[in-house]
Amino acid sequence: FSSEVIEMNISNAINTVSVSGSSSSSAKKTSEKNKWQLTDSLKEKIVELAKKDAKNNIYMGNEFMNLRKAEVAKVAPNRAALIGKFNQSMSSGNMGDMKEIQEADKRWLCILFGIPYEAEYQGEGTGSALHIYNEEGEEVLTYTQGVGWHEKETKAETGVHSALKLAYYEAYHDARK
């Protein structure tokens, strides 16, 4: 393995993953966004785990999966906080059902979820849904009555997953030679 640092960019070039996962009203400025990178020390840890797993005939064991989950969480929006805000509003009597959400304007929904998130109600077709978007315009959550919440992975999360799995695969493959 070389000692280069691998970074990913959510705008299709492989250079930098930058996202802000703030769900509070004090959003970070674009220049202050969190940046994730596959550092040398992280890559060394992945190589160590891949070698250990290869020795035990396990592919992507629990330690690697936990590491991957922790790294992805660094770029993921705080979905639990967003869901909590919605649930709190629903149970407080402010909004009782999807009909009341439909009547709420987009501005109210955006105030509920906080900057930098935006929300949109869709009430046509076979059912109604509430869609929540991050500052990049990516849908991160959808709520439908009767089904509940559905998480959608962001490009940044996908980039981190891909970088970690690639580093692991290469190390595992080398260890099996």
Predicted regions and their residues:
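Type III/flagellar secretion export determinants
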Residues: 1-177
